[in-house]
Amino acid sequence: SANASALLEAIRSEGGTADVVELDLTSETSINLAFEWILRERGVPVSVVINAGYLEGRDIPPDQELLEYIPTELFDTAQHIASRGPFLVAKASLPAMRKQGRGSFLITNNASSLRGRKRRTGQSLYYPRVMMRTLAQVLTEEYSEHGIHVANVIVDGLIDSPGTRALPIAGRHPERIMSPEAIADAFYYLHTQHPSCWTHELQLTPYSTRPSF
């Protein structure tokens, strides 16, 4: 994609190395082929970061906010990306990491993973995010003893981007917009934690807003 190509260029321009490996989170075959390539060409991952998002549900009109109006196929897509997809990525990547005895498996999540809430107009369909959090908890219990640091990272706010800056709230409350660099620092902090003091859930919230619970 254009975003991946731009990121690849930026990394290489700074003297780094990177590859773009596309996969479809709704396809087990696609995920397996992607990790087969990674393991064959680049070796066992040191870290796997799941950061897949989706827009499903944002265009539902205000008079159709109730669950009864939500198409089943919309729910299926959200479930694929938020729960089934991460499950398949874990299956494809963790066996080799377990045998290696080290690594981190970090999941980007949001506040909807903490408790069920009524969906507001313009929001994506976030019900399956609860299952993503549960997956992180299960993997923590199963793989910590094998040297794999699993963490669920709750990004509790709007991340700075051209699209986010165009929103009215960004003009009224710029202090509520989250820095991507600061979020990346938090992920790196998790990845480099000493194994005697692992954090398994981290919530990132702008100072000017109340944390979601």
Report the location of each language-model feature.
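A glycine-rich helix->loop->beta "capping" turn
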Residues: 14-19, 37-50, 56, 71
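The beta1-alpha1 cofactor-binding region of Rossmann-like NAD(H)/NADP(H)-dependent oxidoreductases
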Residues: 22-34
